Amino acid sequence: MTTPTDQQPDANHYLRHLCRLNDTQEVTASEDIYNQFGVLLIAKGSRINPQTQTQLNQHRLKKSLDGQIALQSTLTDELIFQRALKMLEKSPELWSLHCSNRFEAPFRHLCLSENLPLQVRQKLTVMDVQLPDLFEHCLFTGWAAALIAKEIGLKPDICKNAYTCGLLHDIGLLHISADVQTPLSEDNWRALQSHVVIGQRYADDCGLEKSIGRGILEHHERLDCTGYPARKAANKLGLLGQLISSADLLHSLCTNELSRSRHSMHDALPYFKIHRGSFNEAIHSAIIRLLSRTTSDQLDQDTDIPPVNLQRVRDTNIQLKALWLPLLELSQQASICAQPEWLKVSTMMVSIIGILNESGLDDELLSSWLITEMDLDDQANQLDLKEIDAMQYELLWLFKRLGWNLQCLIDAHETPESSASTALAAYHTQLNEQLEQAFSRYLEPKQPSPSSLHEQEQEQEQEQAPPSQQQLANAENAKNAADSDPKSATLSE
């Protein structure tokens, strides 16, 4: 079976971006471009237009295309910094978080002392023009990753690498077809995983520190083995990937669920509580501290926020229990098989069991409270229901990710027919049916193009705009390779 690491970067999609950019500014060959056999394809100074695109598409190049092109106008470190500030200033909460944590001077220093290579700034320029939403997502991720690193107390050079890694973490999406990025089906999810491999290779080819390339590769991995592309064990993961992963998820929350329902960043706390096992303790604690310093008081108190759908909370709680109950036995059956993919699926199941136990969503007292008659005008009840609804929604996506991995395992045919494989296949069928029903409760009739929550699984459906201009990863993501991170439903309360 083809894995993400087997796939080669697709220059065709990137060439399309360059051709479109050539409509607004000159994009030329900075040197003679040869194919792998040394045959001249494009002479130095030639414009990258549809004619040269066709010529280049027919050959494997001797060198990477990125090192052989020149843009008439390229982002500078100062311009990237100013764009990041503009992005923060658009949100009073983000700007307040930036200033209250005294991050103005440190952020300016790490942005302007970075001296990003020309090749990197050119790539970011292409992203800025062709995929502006993705570029803003990368600005946020670089800023947030550096802020979290500072909150932890990491050294300035690590904060700087976190910023750079965040800027480039989704650079591989320039090489991925927009058709793959949305909607995020099982097949598209597999293809999308290659963007982290492409991004790592690009960072390494640009001469950036190896830790940056590794961070790009691992930014959709999770400590509980629920990520991709390799579902590495916790002791095999580096720090940068986990910093980017957490920043990726934060952006997905802020730009999708929380912004649409006029909630504050403080309301992201339930989501990160669910993902406690996904990040190391230092990163998780830093995020909780940062979010705890924000406040919902900045919301317009005169605007009515729709109450939580109580019946949805009740029904979802029942379904989550039905999906959770078979996991322990299934995880034990899967662990008996010595093959790595089976063990990873078993680990994912155990992780979900632990998350449910820690969240208290499986508690009988909670179930009893949910079915009682309650005063929905009571603010305390609404706050509790809002947090429960948010956590349950995240758990549904953990089950969704489990389903994708089960499908990969089933398709791999790694073991002969057995009681364990039969049980997993039956559970996979049940899981898909239950999730389809559960997610349908979150669909907004007036929003036919629901946005995703992640990474990573981290993209947004944008039917009103040309795909070449507005596609996101979203995420995780991706923001949901990431979870970074894309989703088929939006949370409406």
Regions found by a protein language model. Name each.
Residues 454-486:
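Compositionally biased, intrinsically disordered low-complexity segments enriched
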Residues 2-102, 367-427, 451-455, 483-489, ...:
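Membrane-cytosol interface segments
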Residues 243-255:
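Conserved beta-strand-loop-short alpha-helix elements that form
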Residues 50, 65-210, 235, 299-304, ...:
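Acidic/His-rich, divalent-metal-binding segments that scaffold phosphate/diphosphate chemistry
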Residues 188, 198, 255-258, 273:
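Phosphate/pyrophosphate-binding active-site loops
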Residues 37, 87, 144, 198-199, ...:
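A general alpha-helix detector
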Residues 176-177, 225, 255:
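Active-site-flanking alpha-helical
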